[in-house]
Amino acid sequence: MATLRRLREAPRHLLVCEKSNFGNHKSRHRHLVQTHYYNYRVSFLIPECGILSEELKNLVMNTGPYYFVKNLPLHELITPEFISTFIKKGSCYALTYNTHIDEDNTVALLPNGKLILSLDKDTYEETGLQGHPSQFSGRKIMKFIVSIDLMELSLNLDSKKYERISWSFKEKKPLKFDFLLAWHKTGSEESTMMSYFSKYQIQEHQPKVALSTLRDLQCPVLQSSELEGTPEVSCRALELFDWLGAVFSNVDLNNEPNNFISTYCCPEPSTVVAKAYLCTITGFILPEKICLLLEHLCHYFDEPKLAPWVTLSVQGFADSPVSWEKNEHGFRKGGEHLYNFVIFNNQDYWLQMAVGANDHCPP
């Protein structure tokens, strides 16, 4: 019984794999990138490559900026000025920083103007707002989700609904958070976020970029048409997923007898490439920037290359209230929600999407 209990308590994970072609008009690749809003790490691996092109390097170095605002009152995100300045003129993203989704109150502003609040029971009751229990609360409901459509509210700022929400955030239950903010503007107008929040402690940040060349890297052999692989011919998509995790974590893949840290090795069949280029970007990275990277990698094979494939991997913030679109996200024991593209030289691609136990199935 004890063993069975431990198995039940073990965190479950879900990995969804699909294949398509970038030229297919039904391809979902762009939509899935655009609706995974809160990304903290982006990595791409290019086998048989020792240096990045200037165009790709410029894309990598221009994935920012984003902003950190300390002790920002929540009511600042629902003012008419904020809505008209940022939400209506572009895509605005906000996420509470250093809050734990399973323990603390957390907030996220989606680019479509939806404000998502994940509140503990006491805070939820004190705000007086309407919401619903978290889907991951269990029998004893301790977390509630509140969704506020700021675009809808802005249509009638004299409404009782807007007055009630504004009163709740300003007077009834004032809430303050440290926020990460970013704004993707649609026009040529310069960002005014620094000046707009100048009365608060605000800092501008650029994502951190790590570039490295991996020598004599043992890589799985893949066939774009075979997600499940073919014995002695090509590896499975799941095997590649595990291998990428090891590469990104800088795990030694030699599987030598005296290696007591890891016995993992590259799946077979495999091939050794003389060099591979690994780039990792860390920060508050917008989907719009990831779309540009993906588009550029799609055109990587426009000219003949030795590499048969490249990968683009994206990890979301573990404590964001949502994963894809408005899908509620929970932490439990991992909080992972991530996706990976394997881009082949014939424009086929594999898309792998992974979530933890407290998540819906990826879209």
From Swiss-Prot:
Cellular localization per UniProt: Nucleus, Nucleolus
Record's keyword terms, sorted: Nucleus, RNA-binding, rRNA processing, tRNA processing
MF term (GO), any: ribonuclease P RNA binding
A cellular component term, taken from the record's GO annotations: ribonuclease MRP complex
InterPro entries per record: RNase_P_Rpp40
S-S pairs: none
Superkingdom of this protein's organism: Eukaryota
Gene Ontology biological process terms from the UniProt entry: endonucleolytic cleavage in ITS1 to separate SSU-rRNA from 5.8S rRNA and LSU-rRNA from tricistronic rRNA transcript (SSU-rRNA, 5.8S rRNA, LSU-rRNA); tRNA 5'-leader removal
Function description: Component of ribonuclease P, a ribonucleoprotein complex that generates mature tRNA molecules by cleaving their 5'-ends. Also a component of the MRP ribonuclease complex, which cleaves pre-rRNA sequences.
Subunit description: Component of nuclear RNase P and RNase MRP ribonucleoproteins. RNase P consists of a catalytic RNA moiety and about 10 protein subunits; POP1, POP4, POP5, POP7, RPP14, RPP21, RPP25, RPP30, RPP38 and RPP40. Within the RNase P complex, POP1, POP7 and RPP25 form the 'finger' subcomplex, POP5, RPP14, RPP40 and homodimeric RPP30 form the 'palm' subcomplex, and RPP21, POP4 and RPP38 form the 'wrist' subcomplex. All subunits of the RNase P complex interact with the catalytic RNA. Several subunits of RNase P are also part of the RNase MRP complex.
Protein name (Swiss-Prot/TrEMBL): Ribonuclease P protein subunit p40
Organism of derivation: Homo sapiens
